[in-house]
A protein has these predicted regions:
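N-terminal presequence-like segments and the immediate start of the first folded domain
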Residues: 1-62, 68-86
């Protein structure tokens, strides 16, 4: 069975559950005025929310693809990611 988690009136699924797997659409910060650490926290909070909605958590993540627009932001991103992923 496939379960799609779509925003009200949306056409893009934020998350899809299929055969015991959860696939999330791109997760980005809403507040671009934040520094990289703040933006990363905001995106990861959203991921936590979507995973919980699907009945799972970050402890079960198998793979993650991350896009960073400027390598100067890697240290800040990595700091927040490492604290989040435990």
């Amino acid at each position: 069975m496939i379960v799609r988690h779509e925003p009200e009136g949306g056409v893009l699924s934020n998350a899809v559950e299929a055969n015991g797997f959860v696939f999330l659409a791109g997760s980005v910060a809403d507040d671009l005025s934040l520094d990289i650490e703040g933006q990363t926290r905001q995106a990861l909070d959203y991921i936590d929310t979507m995973l919980a909605r699907c009945g799972t958590s970050k402890s079960r993540i198998v793979s993650a693809t991350v896009w960073i627009t400027d390598t100067a932001n890697m240290a800040g991103y990595n700091k927040v990611w490492k604290a989040w992923i435990d």
